[in-house]
Amino acid sequence: MSTKSQVTRRVRTSIATPEDGVHGNNQHKGILDPHLSVLEMLDRQDGDGAGQVEEGAVMTVGKRRVERSLHHSISESWQAIKRSDYSFLSGTHEVGAMHSSVGILSSSDTSEEEAEMRPSAHGTVHLGSSLASPMRQLLVEEDNSCAEEDDCQTVTISMPSSSTSLVMPKLSLSQRLGEPQLLLVGQPARKFWLTIPKCYQKLFDVKNLGMVTRWDVGQRYLAVMVVFHDIAQAPELLDGLCEKAPCPTVIPVCQKGQKSTLAALLKRYTARKCIRVYCSPIIMSNHHEKHRLLKHLHNLCNESESGYETELTVKSKKQHRRPRKKDAGPVALRHWAIWTASFTIGIGIGCCISLMATTRFTFFSSAPLPLTAVIPAQIPSSVASDKPPHRLVPHFYMLCKTTIRQLGTSLRLFFFEKFESRTWVHIFGMDLHSDDPLASLGRLMPLDFIML
């Protein structure tokens, strides 16, 4: 019983009295466990009734004080926790959240974390053994060092938690880059290929014409460069090329002295629309022209790889179009033609108007001239047949001259009789009394042109 009494005394000393609860600020605020009543019951067997009543009163007062202190400690328990005390918990929570967004966590991991973070009945948080493991400490240290030292790494780590995603487009290439795009055929094709720089050799694919298929000439290659060695075999080579594809694009290369003959042959094939000649024949030994051609073809192939239409890929559309009108002449010539036609039409209209307006004009003359008065001489009735034949030409000339003169006189008299008016002349107060009607008409005609 001595042992029980000692335990009872220790428990009683741990209970604060009302005076001690007010003045004892440095004492520990203990919590009564449920088994304290059992110890009191064991101790009650040796005591009397008065002692039991006193002990019961002490227990009641002590229990109320403990409950009040417990409520006060629980309400202010979050204020007693410093930021440094739970910083590792927040870091662990962030690492766990990031890990959950990246991977898949099992149910056991979640239960362990919940058990580790659950507070006990005493108001304290008990950390499990898993938080003290080296792996958890390593993750916390790495996260803190990344947040303090490098912001870029922090952004990189937090990227998996974002909801945005990048979708790469699907790319498809119909033709591999760097693949030969020009076909090189002919007997000295290999020799020509070896003489060009290596940067241009990748553009050509050297093959025999018999090994080339229709798909190669029509679809795979942009053009066919034909190297002619013997001009006598050129028609056979061109005919074989025309059989592979309809109207292929040909880049001719010939030997020295064959350019004119080959140009005439290609012109005949072009007229029949069997082939399309990309350029005039290039002499194989002319390095300047050859280099210019290769450089131009290299640029066209690069543009074709990048997706742009080139001169080699675009088919000729001039055959389907209507023939264009011929270009008009120079602007100055066109203006001169317009001005000349305008003046001519204006003068003609002015003359007609002036003649119609002067229909009432009459010349004051004593008497009209007879038709026979203006005839200078009589035309001989006949020509003697006995004259020599060399006199016929002068007589025929005199006959035509006299006829034209009489016709002019008759027309002049006819116009004098029809257009007899001088109304517009009287407006200006002019008096044209004259015995010579021809002189009067000569003065009137310039005035008519001025009136225009």
From Swiss-Prot:
Keywords assigned: Autophagy, Membrane, Mitochondrion, Mitochondrion outer membrane, Transmembrane, Transmembrane helix, Vacuole
Compartments reported by the entry: Mitochondrion outer membrane; Vacuole membrane; Preautophagosomal structure membrane
Main location class: mitochondrion
Its membrane topology: Single-pass membrane protein
Region (Disordered): 1-28
Single GO cellular component term: mitochondrial outer membrane
Coiled coil stretches, renumbered: none
GO process annotations (BP): autophagy
Keyword Mitochondrion annotated: yes
Residue intervals passing through the bilayer: 336-356
Role played: Mitophagy-specific receptor that recruits the autophagic machinery to mitochondria and regulates selective degradation of mitochondria. Mitophagy contributes to regulate mitochondrial quantity and quality by eliminating the mitochondria to a basal level to fulfill cellular energy requirements and preventing excess ROS production. Recruits ATG11 to the surface of mitochondria. Also promotes autophagy-dependent peroxisome degradation.
Family label: Belongs to the ATG32 family.
Protein name: Autophagy-related protein 32
Organism: Eremothecium gossypii (strain ATCC 10895 / CBS 109.51 / FGSC 9923 / NRRL Y-1056) (Yeast)
